[in-house]
């Protein structure tokens, strides 16, 4: 019985492709997962699963190959008349739009008004003003509107419809890419879960001499890290003072000062020297 759900059908086809690539062990691993119940014989979808397993690989993956062979759809240009800063107050936006409209029609009118009255509210016309880009964008939009005639607008209806169709195609293409990415992530999780982590393979052997009595311990990564840090600290010991002569002079001064302090001096009481002289 073929499933009615399109997404479920795609999941079964993708699972079949992976099982054909990785063998029966992959199928046995998926039996433990309830999401792949169609692998079990008592499941209603097992017949459809078996049918796909018996089909050639090219037939099963034909739709995927056709999807991958589709050409890349170029990103459509941004909307010209709806891309502007939305963080501007309504009053300021009206002033900018009205000024841009007059400027696109005849910029001399606006320039005369600025030179005559020195209107401070039109500072956004200066290139250093934060709203200058918004002003120039609206000027370009109004110039584009004024450049079209009635006949050209009638002729451009077909172009507008074609652009809308291409934009819709691009959006659908982006949605398909997102779905493919999500499906790939899910399959990677399935493949990771199917790895027999409880089974190991012997890669190599190493022998220890029989006369060995003391075995070296395993590497202590923490000690290795500390050892490197200590080695780096020793680099500071080799740095000499910026002024070696000043250091030598200061060391000599300290030594002399230490000698003078080291001599013992006898401090006499007040008038003791005078009394000794009078006795003589």
Curated annotation (Swiss-Prot):
Main location (coarse class): nucleus
Biological-process GO terms, alphabetical: mRNA cis splicing, via spliceosome; mRNA splicing, via spliceosome; U2-type prespliceosome assembly
Pfam families: PRP21_like_P, Surp
Record bears the keyword Transcription regulation: no
Gene Ontology MF: a single term: RNA binding
DNA repair is among the record's keywords: no
Region feature Disordered, mapped onto this chain: 53-72, 246-280
Localization (cell): Nucleus
SURP motif repeats: 11-49, 95-135
GO cellular component term of the entry, any: catalytic step 2 spliceosome
Remarks, miscellaneous: Present with 2490 molecules/cell in log phase SD medium.
Quaternary structure and interacting proteins, as annotated: Belongs to the CWC complex (or CEF1-associated complex), a spliceosome sub-complex reminiscent of a late-stage spliceosome composed of the U2, U5 and U6 snRNAs and at least BUD13, BUD31, BRR2, CDC40, CEF1, CLF1, CUS1, CWC2, CWC15, CWC21, CWC22, CWC23, CWC24, CWC25, CWC27, ECM2, HSH155, IST3, ISY1, LEA1, MSL1, NTC20, PRP8, PRP9, PRP11, PRP19, PRP21, PRP22, PRP45, PRP46, SLU7, SMB1, SMD1, SMD2, SMD3, SMX2, SMX3, SNT309, SNU114, SPP2, SYF1, SYF2, RSE1 and YJU2.
Function description: mRNA splicing factors, PRP9, PRP11, and PRP21, are necessary for binding of the U2 snRNP to the pre-mRNA in an early step of spliceosome assembly.
Protein name: Pre-mRNA-splicing factor PRP21
UniProt source species: Saccharomyces cerevisiae (strain ATCC 204508 / S288c)
């Amino acid at each position: 019985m073929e499933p009615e759900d399109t997404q479920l059908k795609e999941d079964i086809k993708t699972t079949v492709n992976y099982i054909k690539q990785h063998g029966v062990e992959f199928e046995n691993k998926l039996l433990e997962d309830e999401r792949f119940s169609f692998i079990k014989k008592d499941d209603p979808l097992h017949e459809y699963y078996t049918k796909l397993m018996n089909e050639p690989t090219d037939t099963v993956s034909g739709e995927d190959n056709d999807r991958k062979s589709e050409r890349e759809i170029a990103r459509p240009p941004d909307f010209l008349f709806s891309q502007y800063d939305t963080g501007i107050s309504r009053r300021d936006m009206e002033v900018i739009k009205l000024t841009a409209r007059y400027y696109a029609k005849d910029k001399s009118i606006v320039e005369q008004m600025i030179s005559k009255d020195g209107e401070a509210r039109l500072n956004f016309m200066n290139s250093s003003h934060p709203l200058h880009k918004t002003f120039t964008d609206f000027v370009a939009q109004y110039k584009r509107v004024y450049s079209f005639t009635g006949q050209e607008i009638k002729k451009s209806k077909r172009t507008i419809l074609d652009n809308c169709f291409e934009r819709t195609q691009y959006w659908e293409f982006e949605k398909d890419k997102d779905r493919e990415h999500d499906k790939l992530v899910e399959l990677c999780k399935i493949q990771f879960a199917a790895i027999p982590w409880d089974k190991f393979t012997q890669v190599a052997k190493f022998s220890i001499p029989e006369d060995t009595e003391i075995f070296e311990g395993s590497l202590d990564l923490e000690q290795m890290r500390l050892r490197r840090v200590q080695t780096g600290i020793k680099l500071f010991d080799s740095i000499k003072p910026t002024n070696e002569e000043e250091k030598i002079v200061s060391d000599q001064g300290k030594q002399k000062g230490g000698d003078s302090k080291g001599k013992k001096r006898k401090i006499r009481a007040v008038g003791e020297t005078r009394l000794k002289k009078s006795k003589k």
